[in-house]
């Protein structure tokens, strides 16, 4: 970050090295999704499900009064089981980060796009992390951050954030959840 120059007064960011790139994709997508949801709600839209590049944000329930039923994609693309879980959501967001959509393979080893800032290599703690939370921007940031943390660290963060819940898909395919996650599981 020493070559990133932020000028708050001028509201600019300058990258000293012309080969550098700054990708705010996930956070920007989550923020934009949340802005659209709030604007629609302010305009009187009571029932809508937004899906913006995998960020899902519900405004209210479905028109029939039932919650929205959403599958969480199985990161094991070879599996016949397409979803690892199904949730009922109402007025909140569901965002997942994982190693299964943006990746490349070199000599049989798959490298994904979520880089661990400590190792500067793709994070290897999980196959996927899904976050249920009231704000899509925060959900996006949390799913990426927690993907880069050991389970206990991520669980501690989620448990201390009121209203946030998480599902972790471990490398062996097993699932772990935060304490309040069960309330969202489809009945």
Where are these regions (language model features)?
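Mature catalytic core of soluble alpha/beta enzymes
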Residues: 1-187
């Amino acid at each position: 970050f020493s070559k990133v120059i932020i000028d708050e007064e001028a509201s600019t960011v300058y990258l000293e090295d012309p080969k550098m790139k700054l990708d705010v994709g996930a956070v920007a997508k989550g923020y934009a999704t949340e802005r659209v949801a709030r604007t629609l709600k302010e305009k009187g839209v009571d029932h809508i499900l937004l899906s913006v590049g995998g960020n899902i944000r519900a405004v209210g329930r479905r028109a029939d009064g039932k919650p929205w039923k959403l599958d969480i994609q199985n990161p094991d693309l070879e599996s016949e089981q397409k979803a690892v879980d199904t949730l009922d959501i109402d007025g909140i967001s569901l965002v997942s980060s994982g190693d299964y959509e943006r990746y490349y393979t070199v000599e049989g080893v798959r490298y994904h796009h979520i880089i661990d800032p400590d190792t500067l290599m793709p994070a290897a703690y999980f196959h996927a992390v899904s976050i249920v939370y009231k704000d899509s921007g925060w959900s996006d940031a949390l799913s990426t951050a927690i993907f880069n943390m050991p389970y206990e660290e991520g669980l501690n963060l989620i448990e201390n954030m009121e209203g946030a819940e998480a599902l972790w898909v471990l490398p062996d395919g097993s699932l772990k959840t935060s304490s309040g996650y069960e309330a969202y599981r489809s009945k």
